[in-house]
Amino acid sequence: MQAINGLVAGILALTLVACGGGGGSSSAPPPAPPVADGGDSGGDTAGGTEEEDACGVAAQIDFVEAVTDSWYLWYDEMTNVEKSDYASAQAYLDARLKPLLDDGRDRGFSYMTTITEDETSFTSGAYVGFGFRTSSTATQIFIIDAFESGPAWAAGVRRGMELVAVDTGSGFETLDELSAREATSEEIFGPGEVGVVRNFRFVQNDAEVEISIAKDELAPPALAGEPLLIERAGLTPVGYLHLRQFINAALTPEEGFPSLADATTLFKEANVTDLIIDFRYNGGGLLSVADTMMDLLAGLTATGEPSFKIQVNDQHPDFNDDTDNWGLFDELPETFSPIRVAFITSSSTASASELVINGLDPHVEVVMVGEDSF
């Protein structure tokens, strides 16, 4: 796990508004969009309308150039390239960042997106699918999570089941058979469209079970299941919660699903001093949700202390010094004060998850159990 101060500032999601404009993402400071003049951008503008020019590749590349030159953390180490050599803004961005991509400092943190994709990913996590996640060994595939709001859960799929065969429309094929004919992931699981059906054969409790599932649009609950109290003789119970992702549903979930505040209220009322937080598959999300989570866990212990600081490159000292760009611990009505927190982590634990671990570490006894984070 890396110190978070450099990590957050290195992320640069470039969001295109109406093709030619720009805006900030949930992970980076909002850059000022350049004005697309439709003239000296390196593209052919003859015969195009002003709107078409603003939505053209040349205008998008101009936008990427302006944002990276101004805001990218390692702006002085980017490659100088000819904009006219690139057919897309993403290709141009990759070319400029090649030294940072090659040495691993930028591990795919910088990419092109749209407002709709960005908001969907970070606010609700909504997508079209079956509603489960898998992990594989050399010869086996296991269900590691089934989303309570999804079709797979409704059909009976649960964590720990082993997937052994799939019927893509012509009868069941084992994983070995699918591998032997080099079936693609899309062949096996189908395209991301509502109504796509697959029949799966699972092993559960040493028995085979066949389940048919149709893909649907779903928004996975932020918390996996209910927060738990693990009883122990002669001591207060241990608290446990599994947070899938830092999305708005962690604070304001759909009816019937728990929030982070529900979890900490439960722990507070049970006088929990030792807490387990499962971040194994949590790749991050909204800073605002991470900020609230830290308030719920150390808002009393560390009131007024910084929980994180968003730092950008040295071209923006005023931004770096502005306390409005810091997170400060604040006590909330549901805040409780654990003495010890154990985080279960893996190589998939990233971004906002690492921020929470780092932010709590000076104020709470923190340990990481499992694999190193991303």
Q: Where do the language-model regions lie?
A:
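Bacterial N-terminal signal peptides that target proteins for export
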Residues: M1-V8
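Gly/Ser/Thr-rich loop/hinge elements
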Residues: G234, G284-F343, S348
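Flexible, low-complexity junctional segments that flank or bridge functional domains
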Residues: G22-L275, V289
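Short, well-structured beta-strand/strand-turn elements
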Residues: H363-F374
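C-terminal motif of bacterial Sec signal peptides marking the signal peptidase cleavage site
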Residues: T15-A18
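Secretome/extracellular-domain signature
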Residues: V356-I357
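Residue-level signal for short, function-critical loop segments
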Residues: F147, R244, S347-S348, D372
